[in-house]
UniProtKB/Swiss-Prot annotation:
EC number: 5.6.2.4
Annotated positions binding ATP: 432-439
Reactions listed under catalytic activity: Couples ATP hydrolysis with the unwinding of duplex DNA by translocating in the 3'-5' direction; ATP + H2O = ADP + phosphate + H(+)
GO cellular component, one term: host cell nucleus
GO molecular function: ATP binding; ATP hydrolysis activity; DNA binding; DNA helicase activity
PTM comment, free text: Phosphorylated. Sumoylated.
Protein name from the UniProt record: Replication protein E1
Subunit description: Can form hexamers. Interacts with E2 protein; this interaction increases E1 DNA binding specificity. Interacts with host DNA polymerase subunit POLA2. Interacts with host single stranded DNA-binding protein RPA1. Interacts with host TOP1; this interaction stimulates the enzymatic activity of TOP1.
Any GO BP: DNA replication
Region of interest: DNA-binding region: 144-307
Organism of origin: Human papillomavirus 38
Length: 604
C-alpha cells in the first residue's frame, strides 16, 4: 500500500501551523503602524496625490481652434470650384487689379437640359475664370518666414514681370505698349523694325547706345522717361527677337527680363502718328530717315486725294504687258508691287483676291488668244523674235541640218510649205534612231514661237487636242505605233488641212483647222504599208546621226532662241515670209494694246 500524502499524523500537527500561528500582541501592532506612518512622511513618494484646487487652462481654446481649422478646410474642399485660393493675388491685390485689356467671361448656354447633372458641371466649369488653382498649405512657421518670402518674390518676378513692365510703360508714356506693337509669338521670327521698352537702364549707357546702334540701324527713335526708355530701331537686316534682346541687353547692361520687344504696327495710322509727332519733340533722339510705313501714313501726298480702290483693269493690263498668264505667278508678282503700286496695295487689302486673280488670268488668256488669231504666221514669227534678247548665230542650225545629211535647200523648201500650213503639207515628221536630237530641235522651235504641245498619254481624254486651239504651231513628241494607229483612224482630216470639230472643255465643240504640226517618232512611215494613207499627208525628215557633245558634255550645236531668231532674220526672204510693212508694221511707233481706260493726265 502506498504512502499517504499530506502531513504526518503521528505528531498531531505539523510545524507549519505552529510557525504561522505565532503573532505579536495587538498593542505592539498599533505602535508599529504609527511608527510606519511617521517614518513614511519624509520618503521619496511623498505628495503623490495632489490635493490642491484644480484651475481650468487653455485646453478649450486649443480645441476650438482645431475644430475651426478643420471646419474651414472642409468648407474649402466643398467650395473649391467657386473659391480657389489665389496666392499671387493675395500677395499683391493692387498689382493684380491692373489689367491692360478687358477680360470677358465665356457666354453661358441659354438652354440647359436638366438630366444627369454632367452638363451642368461642364457649364459651371466653363463660366469660371480659367486660372491655376493653388492648393492650400499651412502657414510657414515664424522661423521660416524669410525663406517663404523669398520664394514668393521669385514667383512674382517670374510670372508678372511683363505685366509690371507694361504698367510702368503706360505710366511713363501715357500709351499702352500693345497699341504701338503687334505680337510675334515666336522668338525666331525675323523683322527689320523692332520696338523696345527697356526698364532701369543707366543714363550714360543710354547716351552711348545712340552712337553704338547707328552701325546696326538706318533709323533710330529714342525717348527716355525714368525708369523706362523707348526705342524704335529699323535694322539694316532682319533680326529675330532673341538677337535684338541680346544686343540691347549687352549695350545697356540690363537683364533680358527687363526688355519688352515687339515689331511695330506698320499699318496703324495712330501708331504712325505717335512716332511722327514724337520725332518733332526736342527730348526725342532721331537718327536717319523715317521708314516708309511712317511717311506713307503721315505725309500728305497726291495719292491720298483719291479713295484707295482696287481696279481690276489695271491688274489685267500689268499681267498682259508682262506676259503673265499663270494664276500663281500673277498673284505672287502683283503682291510684290504693293510697296510701290497703290492698286497692288488695294488688291492685298481686298477680301476677294482669289476671284480677281482667276478673272485676271482668264482675261489675259482671252486677249493673248485674240491677238494671236489676228496675226498671220509671218506677223507672229516677227512678234516672237522681236522679244528675244541677245544675239545668236544662225549657222548653228544650218550646220546641224547638214550634220544630219540633209540638203539645206530641200529642208528650206519643206519648212517653207510647212509654215504656210498648206493642205497635206502642214505635218512635218522628224524620225530617226534615239538620241539624234529630234526632240531638242523641235522643242527649241516650239519654245521660240510659243507653240502648244500635246501628249498622246492623255488620249483617253476627249480634250487632249484642246491646246492646239491656243497655238500658232503644235508639237506631238515621240509618237509610237499606238499613236500612229490613232492618227490613221481619227486625224486624217486634220492632216488634210480641212476643218475639224475640236472638243473644248466647258464649251461647245469648235470648228477649226489644225495649226502646223511637228511630230517626232522613231518609226519611218514610208516603210510601214499599213499607214499608206498617211504617206501623202506627212512630210518626213530623217535624223540618222546622234547628237554630238564636246568633252565637257555640252552640245556642239546651240539650238537656242537667239539662234532661231537669227535664222529667221537671215532667211526671211527665202522662207517667203511676208514683209511687215505690208501688214501695217512700220516700226514700234504704234500704241501697244491697252485694256484699261487711261486718263489723259494719268501716270505714265
Amino acid at each position: 500500500m502506498a504512502d499517504d500524502k499530506g502531513t504526518d499524523p503521528k505528531e498531531g500537527c505539523s510545524d507549519f501551523i505552529y510557525l504561522e500561528a505565532e503573532c505579536s500582541d495587538i498593542s505592539d501592532l498599533d505602535n508599529d503602524l504609527e511608527t510606519l506612518l511617521e517614518e513614511g512622511a519624509g520618503s521619496d513618494i511623498s505628495d503623490l496625490i495632489n490635493d490642491e484646487v484644480v484651475e481650468q487652462g487653455n485646453s478649450r481654446e486649443l480645441l476650438c481652434q482645431q475644430e475651426r481649422e478643420e471646419s474651414e478646410l472642409q468648407v474649402q474642399y466643398l467650395k473649391r470650384k467657386c473659391f480657389s485660393p489665389k496666392a499671387v493675388q493675395e500677395l499683391s491685390p493692387r498689382l493684380q487689379s491692373m489689367n491692360i485689356s478687358s477680360e470677358h467671361k465665356s457666354k453661358r448656354r441659354l438652354f440647359v437640359e436638366q438630366d444627369s447633372g454632367l452638363e451642368l458641371s461642364l457649364n459651371e466649369a466653363e463660366d469660371s475664370t480659367q486660372e491655376l488653382e493653388v492648393p492650400a498649405s499651412a502657414p510657414a512657421p515664424a522661423a521660416e518666414g524669410d525663406i517663404g518670402l523669398g520664394t514668393v518674390r521669385d514667383l512674382l518676378r517670374s510670372s508678372n514681370s511683363r505685366a509690371t513692365l507694361l504698367s510702368k510703360f503706360k505710366d511713363s508714356f501715357g500709351v499702352s505698349f500693345t497699341e504701338l506693337t503687334r505680337q510675334y509669338k515666336s522668338n525666331k521670327t525675323c523683322c527689320h523694325h523692332w520696338v523696345l521698352a527697356v526698364y532701369a537702364a543707366k543714363d550714360d549707357l543710354i547716351d552711348a547706345s545712340k552712337q553704338l546702334l547707328q552701325q546696326h540701324c538706318f533709323y533710330i527713335w529714342l525717348q527716355s522717361f525714368c525708369p523706362m526708355s523707348l526705342y524704335l530701331c529699323c535694322f539694316n537686316v532682319g533680326k529675330s527677337r532673341d538677337t535684338v534682346v541680346r544686343l540691347i541687353a549687352t549695350l545697356l547692361q540690363v537683364h533680358e527680363n527687363h526688355i519688352l520687344s515687339e515689331p511695330p504696327k506698320n499699318r496703324s495710322i495712330p501708331a504712325a502718328l505717335f512716332w511722327y509727332k514724337g520725332s518733332l519733340n526736342s527730348n526725342v533722339f532721331c537718327f536717319g530717315e523715317a521708314p516708309d510705313w511712317i511717311l506713307s501714313q503721315t505725309m500728305i501726298q497726291h495719292q491720298t486725294a483719291d479713295t484707295l480702290q482696287f481696279d481690276l483693269s489695271r491688274m489685267i493690263q500689268w499681267a498682259y504687258d508682262n506676259d503673265h498668264i499663270d494664276e500663281s505667278i500673277i498673284a505672287y508678282q502683283y503682291a510684290k508691287l504693293a510697296d510701290i503700286d497703290s492698286n497692288a496695295k488695294a488688291f492685298l487689302a481686298h477680301n476677294s483676291q482669289v476671284k480677281y486673280v482667276k478673272e485676271c488670268a482668264l482675261m489675259v488668256r482671252y486677249y493673248k488668244r485674240g491677238e494671236m488669231k489676228e496675226m498671220s504666221i509671218s506677223a507672229w514669227i516677227h512678234h516672237c523674235i522681236s522679244k528675244v534678247e541677245g544675239e545668236g548665230n544662225w549657222q548653228h542650225i544650218v550646220r546641224f541640218i547638214r550634220y544630219q545629211n540633209l540638203n539645206f535647200i530641200m529642208f528650206l523648201d519643206k519648212f517653207r510649205t510647212f509654215l504656210k500650213n498648206l493642205p497635206k503639207k502642214n505635218c512635218l515628221l522628224i524620225y530617226g534612231p534615239p538620241d539624234t536630237g529630234k526632240s531638242m530641235f523641235a522643242m527649241s522651235l516650239i519654245k521660240l514661237l510659243k507653240g502648244s504641245v500635246v501628249s498622246f498619254a492623255n488620249s483617253k481624254s476627249q480634250f487632249w487636242l484642246q491646246p492646239l486651239a491656243d497655238g500658232k504651231i503644235g508639237l506631238l513628241d515621240d509618237a509610237t505605233d499606238v499613236c500612229w494607229q490613232y492618227i490613221d483612224s481619227f486625224l486624217r482630216n486634220g492632216l488634210d488641212g480641212n476643218l475639224v470639230s475640236l472638243d473644248i472643255k466647258h464649251k461647245a465643240p469648235c470648228q477649226m483647222k489644225f495649226p502646223p504640226l511637228i511630230i517626232t517618232s522613231n518609226i519611218n512611215l514610208l516603210k510601214e504599208e499599213r499607214y499608206r494613207f498617211l504617206h501623202s499627208r506627212v512630210t518626213q525628215i530623217d535624223f540618222p546621226n546622234k547628237f554630238p557633245f564636246d568633252s565637257d558634255n555640252k552640245p556642239l550645236f546651240e539650238l537656242t532662241d537667239q539662234s532661231w531668231a537669227s535664222f529667221f532674220k537671215r532667211l526671211w526672204t527665202q522662207l517667203e515670209l511676208s514683209d511687215q510693212e505690208d501688214e501695217g508694221d512700220n516700226g514700234n511707233s504704234q500704241r501697244t494694246f491697252h485694256c484699261t481706260a487711261r486718263e489723259v493726265n494719268g501716270h505714265i
